[in-house]
């Protein structure tokens, strides 16, 4: 594939967006969100059709395989009191051993190594935390928790008691229902600090309708972390590196994909995290999907040929984000920006609680399709 030099520049993935287009609340029911359907290549204009997510079932076929991400968002945002006075926030990301956890802090400049922090709840003894060091790779802080919160299961109990679901900063409206509404209906494996948002559109009713049509379902796990939501700062994308995220692709997923291929079905990823999980597992297998459990730091951008994924249901992503690069790898950068302009013109809602886009396998660039 011959790339336009601009495809390797981060600044080429910018687009203007009125803040009013950023969804602050989810629609109800889930499947009532709008759906931009990307026309297959070779079709006459327009480049897209407009529908609702409920109508997506009409685009799928019996024998197709949907791959969902079953991660569950932790209540990973902690509000703490600093020993010198004032409040701060911690977003707990990943373990660093011996009760230490990597956290993003706010305000970061006031969280210095050696600082004491206090986690408080009404009627309970405060829990003492301590900032151990700065983490240069992430810009975060390594924080010491009490030793009995050394593993993920123990920490989850603490987060459930003291924490909040960490909504993205562009969502200004917070509601108690967010703790469930910012989860997919099938979220079952705790570990993420952000939701796999394309899956938020799949209601129980839509999942049942797809099942009745003969569409198959399998689930991978990718615990959404720093690699998904951290801003890209590398202008020359040939040197881009992403923070790794924990992935599990089980034997039954591999079997489901093989069975799908055998019946001439299509492998459809629900969300970019499902793409990253499948393609990361295939990369570990030398280009062939195999079961996998471990970190994935795969960068998908224009020029990438997919090994597993044929089509994609996805949300509208932030300018200059790694997710925008991934979707551009499927449909081409200029075409994707034209599709985003179409969505903006028709008043689609953007980002986590926003509307969706359906990329049919026929809309994927031929050079990017699985062999």
Swiss-Prot record:
GO terms for molecular function: S-adenosylmethionine:tRNA ribosyltransferase-isomerase activity. Pathway: tRNA modification; tRNA-queuosine biosynthesis. One of its GO terms (biological process) is tRNA wobble guanine modification. It catalyses: 7-aminomethyl-7-carbaguanosine(34) in tRNA + S-adenosyl-L-methionine = epoxyqueuosine(34) in tRNA + adenine + L-methionine + 2 H(+). InterPro entries: QueA (IPR003699), QueA_dom1 (IPR042118), QueA_dom2 (IPR042119), QueA_sf (IPR036100). The keyword Chloroplast does not apply. One of its GO terms (cellular component) is cytoplasm. Its EC number is 2.4.99.17. SUPFAM superfamilies: QueA-like. Pfam families: Queuosine_synth. It is found in: Cytoplasm. Transmembrane segments: none annotated. Keywords: Cytoplasm, Queuosine biosynthesis, S-adenosyl-L-methionine, Transferase. The keyword Transferase applies. Transfers and isomerizes the ribose moiety from AdoMet to the 7-aminomethyl group of 7-deazaguanine (preQ1-tRNA) to give epoxyqueuosine (oQ-tRNA). Monomer. Belongs to the QueA family. HAMAP family: QueA. This is S-adenosylmethionine:tRNA ribosyltransferase-isomerase. It comes from Prochlorococcus marinus (strain MIT 9303). The gene is queA.
């Amino acid at each position: 594939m011959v790339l336009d030099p601009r495809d390797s520049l981060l600044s080429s993935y910018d687009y203007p967006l009125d803040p009013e287009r950023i969804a602050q609340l989810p629609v109800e029911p889930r499947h009532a969100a709008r759906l931009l359907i990307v026309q297959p290549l070779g079709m006459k204009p327009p480049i897209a059709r407009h529908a609702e997510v409920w109508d997506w079932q009409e685009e799928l076929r019996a024998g197709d395989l949907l791959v969902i991400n079953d991660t569950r968002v932790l209540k990973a945002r902690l509000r703490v009191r600093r020993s010198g006075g004032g409040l701060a926030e911690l977003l707990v990301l990943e373990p660093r051993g011996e009760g230490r956890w990597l956290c993003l802090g706010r305000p970061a400049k006031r969280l210095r190594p050696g600082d004491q922090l206090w986690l408080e709840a009404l009627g309970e003894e405060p829990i003492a935390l301590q900032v151990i060091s700065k983490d240069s790779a992430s810009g975060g802080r390594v924080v010491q928790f009490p030793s009995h919160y050394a593993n993920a299961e123990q920490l989850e109990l603490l987060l459930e008691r003291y924490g909040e679901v960490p909504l993205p900063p562009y969502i200004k409206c917070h509601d108690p229902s967010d703790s469930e509404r910012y989860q997919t209906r099938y979220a079952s494996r705790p570990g993420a600090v952000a939701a796999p948002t394309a899956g938020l559109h799949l209601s129980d009713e839509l999942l049942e309708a797809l099942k009745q049509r003969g569409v198959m379902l399998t689930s991978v796990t990718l615990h959404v972390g720093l690699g998904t939501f951290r801003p890209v700062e590398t202008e020359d994308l040939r040197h881009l590196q992403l923070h790794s995220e924990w992935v599990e692709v089980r034997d039954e997923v591999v079997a489901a994909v093989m069975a799908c291929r055998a019946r001439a079905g299509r492998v459809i990823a629900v969300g970019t995290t499902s793409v990253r999980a499948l393609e990361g597992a295939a990369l570990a297998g030398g280009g062939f999907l195999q079961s996998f459990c471990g970190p994935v730091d795969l960068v998908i951008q224009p020029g990438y040929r997919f090994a597993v994924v044929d089509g994609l249901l996805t949300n509208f992503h932030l300018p200059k984000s790694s997710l925008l690069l991934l979707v551009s790898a499927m449909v081409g950068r200029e075409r994707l920006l034209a599709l985003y302009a179409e969505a903006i013109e028709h008043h689609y809602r953007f980002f986590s609680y926003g509307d969706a886009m359906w990329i049919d396998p026929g809309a994927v660039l031929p050079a990017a399709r699985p062999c």
